Amino acid sequence: MLITGFPAGMLQCNCYVLADRAGTDAVIVDPGQRAMGPLRRILDENRLTPSAVLLTHGHIDHMWSAQKVSDTYGCPTYIHPEDRFMLTDPLFGFGPRVAQVVTGAFFREPKQVVELDRDGDKLDLGSVTVNVDHTPGHTRGSVCFWVAADTDVVLTGDTLFERTIGRTDLFGGSGRDLYRSIVEKLLVLDDKTVVLPGHGNSTTIGAERRFNPFLEGL
């Protein structure tokens, strides 16, 4: 499987591109600020055609370029219904600091939006099959995407990071829900599963089970 990514924009959100191989359909996850340029290069170099934009949640650093990518390539954007309102209001509850940075930015929904309204759903997106788990805690509509490959991969957004977990002090956040999501949806995965988080370095489920101080005793 072809998996690559890059940190996008000021807030350094990891944008990922997944495909079975070069020359096939591709899935784009969390295209943040100024993602179009790097995405075009990756798609062109690997002869990839986007089949979907997947959003782990609706915060601005993860969805900034979703509408542009989706409408440019004519593919749908997938988001949980609890976070759909953030496609047009991604700063809701995000705090004044970020609002000042993006003053004047205008957001609208992509022409094609698909709601991820079924927990445990399986999406067949061209060459890639993605399993969707609703993992509220960081936001009410946060989801994780699990992909079976030679080594399984889970894209965790802002739910789980290397040696830390997602913040829960923004609108819709819940510490109780976050821990339940991690325990019931992530720690049940094989230790070798590669974790691709929304920010920072990749890790594995096993490494976080052993070394993440926020998961001690779980």
Curated annotation (Swiss-Prot):
Family matches, as InterPro entries: MBL_Glyoxalase_II, Metallo-B-lactamas, RibonucZ/Hydroxyglut_hydro
Cofactor note: Binds 2 Zn(2+) ions per subunit.
Record has DNA damage as a keyword: no
Family annotation (Gene3D superfamilies): Ribonuclease Z/Hydroxyacylglutathione hydrolase-like (3.60.15.10)
Positions bound to Zn(2+) 1: H57, H59, H138, D158
Binding-site residues for Zn(2+) 2, renumbered to this chain: D61, H62, D158, H199
SMART domains named among the record's database cross-references: Lactamase_B
Pfam families: Lactamase_B
Cofactor (UniProt): Zn(2+)
Gene Ontology MF term list: hydrolase activity; metal ion binding
Protein family according to the UniProt entry: Belongs to the metallo-beta-lactamase superfamily. Glyoxalase II family.
Stated name of the protein: Uncharacterized protein ML0493
The organism of origin for this protein: Mycobacterium leprae (strain TN)
